[in-house]
A protein has these predicted regions:
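Active-site-proximal acidic segments at structured loop/helix or strand boundaries
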Residues: 123-217
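Mobile-element integrase/transposase regions
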Residues: 1-33, 44-45, 188-199
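Short acidic, glycine/serine/threonine-rich loops at helix termini
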Residues: 74-79, 117-121, 169-172
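Active-site beta-loop-alpha junctions of metal-dependent nucleic acid enzymes
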Residues: 18-19, 35-63, 82-87
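RNase H-like two-metal-ion nuclease catalytic core shared by retroviral integrases
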Residues: 66-67, 84-85, 96, 105-128, ...
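Acidic/histidine-rich, metal-coordinating catalytic segments
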Residues: 59-86, 110
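Acidic, His- and aromatic-enriched active-site or binding-groove loops in soluble protein domains
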Residues: 87-103, 127-138
Length: 218
């Protein structure tokens, strides 16, 4: 599973450039792929992308490999060799997600993102396919995000048609999905500061001054 930025495709939603990425899941043998649109590589986005892919596939692989994004891993310390030697461990939320589906975690080594080569290669291939389908469509403008996402689904469906033979070999050794999907969003209560700001996942957001010192749900 990997988050790949798609903003370079210059897709617009109601005339505005849509800055977004795709949480992209790929099976390494068949190259079967699926993904969901997100606007940051957060744990919620990874949860949405992974769960949607598992539900679409209908089966659960043994392992899930990811890079060292902050959605899945956190820094544990710095090794003697310096910056590239930083070690990372999995976040609690990511491990809980995998445990829910009976998956094992595997990540690339810090400084070696090319170890996630299968999905990285498919990222480029999918972007090229989307570019071609946008040209055939004659427009990069969409009325809504879900309309654009449906367009992406159709592109991935088409690419997956030629992968069915190898896919059958992969799912033959997998277990069916039996777990109920987890919620893809998390509600949290926070108090508005005297400066009319709230802190959510280490980021500050401005809210109306009428909410100062009040507790709000985000």
């Amino acid at each position: 599973v990997d988050g790949t930025w798609m903003t370079e495709l210059k897709v617009t939603i109601q005339g505005e450039l849509f800055k977004h990425l795709l949480i992209h899941c790929v099976l390494p043998y068949s190259n079967w792929e699926w993904g969901r649109v997100a606007q940051s590589e957060s744990l919620s986005a990874v949860r949405l992308g992974l769960q949607s892919s598992l539900c679409k596939l209908g089966y659960v692989p043994e392992w899930v490999q990811t890079d060292n994004s902050s959605a899945a891993t956190r820094r544990l310390g710095v090794a003697e060799e310096g910056e590239e030697g930083k070690t990372r461990g999995y976040t609690v939320g990511y491990l809980q997600l995998l445990e829910h589906y009976g998956l094992k975690a595997q990540s690339t080594h810090v400084g070696n993102p090319n170890e996630n080569g299968d999905v990285e290669s498919q990222n480029g291939g999918l972007k090229q396919a989307v570019k071609q389908h946008l040209l055939l469509r004659g427009s990069r403008e969409f009325a809504r995000i879900d309309e654009y996402e449906a367009f992406l689904f159709a592109v991935m469906e088409k690419r997956n048609r030629s992968r069915q033979e190898r896919l059958a070999e992969e799912i033959a050794v997998m277990k069916p999905v039996t777990a109920t999907p987890l919620a893809t969003s998390i509600e949290k209560k926070v108090r508005v500061s005297s400066g009319s700001l709230i802190q959510v996942q280490r980021r500050s957001y401005s809210v109306p001054t009428s909410l100062i010192k009040k507790e709000v749900t985000v």
